[in-house]
Design a protein with these regions (language model features):
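Extended intrinsically disordered, low-complexity coil regions enriched in Ser, Thr, Gly, Ala
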Residues: 41-49, 57-68, 114-128, 175, ...
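Short, structured motif recognition centered on aromatic/hydrophobic residues
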Residues: 30, 44, 101-112, 120, ...
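Mid-chain, structured segments of secreted extracytoplasmic proteins
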Residues: 57-96
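Extended amphipathic alpha-helical interaction segments
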Residues: 106-225
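Start-of-domain marker
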Residues: 20-55
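A cross-kingdom marker for long, charged
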Residues: 27-28, 185-188, 192-275
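Bacterial signal peptide processing site
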Residues: 13-16
Length: 275
């Protein structure tokens, strides 16, 4: 999942740098939610480094193979169904990371104190207030502008500069596929409630046997997998938007997309080999 975010948000030049910094970035992100104490910090830092080492050795080749398949199809017409097929192929890679991380995280999360759970509640409340202000309570025209801006930024990271005509086509697709912010909000609250329920249920448990550790990890994996599920309607809309844009791609944009994907593959191969 973290690698997917890297690919979406970064250019090739920054991918290797952030990937190798993921344990540090993840630690401080988690500290912002749980106020990690001195007893928990060493195990968490070591666990995050171990997850990254496992991902480099075991997951990067599969991710790179998928990127290679995508690159080879770029010069051909692509349907929304094909786009969704690539996303579906990536899901096992996301789940593998979630599952591996849960095995490590469960051992630390059970040590959270009551004060840390209250800290978590405050952090969630703050983030939810910001999310509501940006998305749920915003004017429709502002929502469309924000959605369009994000879509164009993500497309330009792969394809390079986008023309006014292409921007209007993306805007038309976004207008046709209305995003259900209320449903997204309810999903957000449900996932947060499920995770908080796990934290409360397992806080203070002694995981001193392989069976106890496995049960805690599997329970956490189920919570995280449910939270990571992508609603089918949103997935299909995103896939169709990408397919529509692909049909408008210029030769220069095609060349840039190929260059971008080849850069990703080169960086991931280097990371896999220890870079």
């Amino acid at each position: 999942m973290t690698l997917c975010l890297c690919l979406t948000l970064l250019g090739c030049s920054a991918l290797k740098l952030l990937y190798n910094q993921l344990p540090t970035v993840s630690y401080w992100w988690l500290d912002g939610y749980f106020d990690i104490n001195d007893q928990q910090a060493p195990d968490l830092k070591l666990g995050l480094r171990d997850v990254l080492a496992w991902h480099k050795a075991n997951e990067l080749p599969a991710v790179n193979a998928l990127l290679s398949d995508v690159e080879q199809q770029l010069e051909k017409p692509i349907t929304g169904a094909q786009m969704c097929g690539w996303f579906t192929r990536f899901e096992p890679r996301v789940n593998a990371v979630l599952d591996r991380t849960a095995v490590m995280a469960a051992l630390i999360l059970v040590t959270l104190t009551a004060d840390q759970l209250r800290y978590f509640d405050k952090a969630i409340a703050k983030n939810n207030a910001e999310w509501r202000e940006e998305w749920l309570d915003a004017r429709p025209e502002d929502l469309m502008e924000s959605r369009l801006e994000r879509a164009i930024e993500n497309l330009e990271r792969v394809y390079g500069p986008i023309s006014r005509q292409q921007t209007e086509a993306v805007k038309a697709r976004l207008a046709k596929d209305a995003y259900d912010f209320e449903q997204n909000w309810q999903n957000r609250l449900r996932n947060q409630t499920a995770f908080k329920g796990w934290l409360v249920a397992y806080r203070g448990r002694v995981l001193d046997t392989p069976e106890a550790k496995q049960a805690a990890a599997q329970s956490l994996q189920a919570v995280w997998r449910a939270a990571a599920e992508w609603r089918m309607t949103e997935r299909q809309q995103t896939c169709q938007l990408l397919a529509d844009f692909h049909s408008l791609m210029t030769p220069a944009q095609w060349a840039q997309a190929v260059k971008t994907y080849q850069g990703y593959q080169k960086d991931l191969q280097s990371l896999h080999l220890g870079g």
